[in-house]
Amino acid sequence: MKFFVDTADVAAIAELNDLGMVDGVTTNPSLILKSGRDITEVTKEICELVDGPVSAEVVATQADAMIAEGRKLAEIAENITVKLPLTWDGLKACKTLTDEGKMVNVTLCFSANQALLAAKAGASFISPFIGRLDDLNVDGMELIEDIRTIYDNYGYETEILAASIRTVNHMKEAALIGADVATAPPGVIKQMANHVLTDKGLAAFLSDWEKTGQKIL
C-alpha cells in the first residue's frame, strides 16, 4: 500500500520523505489555510520535494470553472493531480481533464455508487472518507471493501485512496482490505512505529546492558 501524506506542511513532508515513507501528497483548501502560504507557492515546493502525485484541489463548483482551475493547477508541475469533488459537475470535469491526460483525484466519496461513477469518468484516484463516515456510526472500512470488490469485478484502474484517516488502525484496516493508497496526517504515520511492548522491551534491554558495564563506542 502506498503512503500519501495529508498535509501542506513542507517540513513534515520532508522528514517522512527522507525515510522513504512518502509516495505522494494530498492537500485541500483547509490544509492550505493551515499552512498560511500561497497555494501555488507551497504546492510547487511540495512537487519539487516529492516525486509522486501531489493533489491540489479546485474550489469552483461548476464544471467549466473546475476545468479551468484544474488546468491552471496542472501547470504548477508534472506530478500535480487535480482534486475534484464528487458531484455531477465534478464528474464532468473529471472526464474532460482525464481525456486531456491529466491525473484526477475525485474526493469526498461516501458511497460505492459514487466510486463507480468516478471510475467510469476516468478518475486516477477515488478518495473515500473513512473518518467522516465513522463519525456517523457508519463503518468506513466497509465502503473501502465494497469499492475494492466492484473495481476488481470489472477491472477498473482507478486507485482507491483511503482518506480521512485518523488512527493507526485505519491504516492497518485499509492495508488489509486492499486500498491502493492511504493518505494520512504525518502524526498518524509516525504513530505506526509505536507499541507499548516495544517500549517495554527496549527499556529492559537497556537496563540489562547498563549492568554489563560495557560500551559499544
Swiss-Prot record:
Annotated EC: 2.2.1.2
Q: Name one GO biological process term.
A: carbohydrate metabolic process
**Cross-referenced SUPFAM superfamilies:** Aldolase
Q: Where is the active site?
A: 83 (schiff-base intermediate with substrate)
Supply the InterPro entries for this chain: Aldolase_TIM, TAL/FSA, Transaldolase_3B, Transaldolase_3B/F6P_aldolase, Transaldolase_AS, TSA/FSA_arc/bac
Q: Major location, coarse class?
A: cytoplasm
The main enzyme category here is: transferase
Q: Which Pfam families match?
A: TAL_FSA
GO terms under cellular component: cytoplasm
Catalysed conversion reaction: D-sedoheptulose 7-phosphate + D-glyceraldehyde 3-phosphate = D-erythrose 4-phosphate + beta-D-fructose 6-phosphate
Q: Which compartment or compartments is the protein found in?
A: Cytoplasm
Keywords from the UniProt entry:
Cytoplasm, Pentose shunt, Schiff base, Transferase
What Gene3D superfamilies does this protein's entry cite?
Aldolase class I
Q: What does this protein do?
A: Transaldolase is important for the balance of metabolites in the pentose-phosphate pathway.
Quote the NCBIfam families the UniProt record gives.
fsa_talC_mipB
Task: Report what the protein is called.
Answer: Probable transaldolase
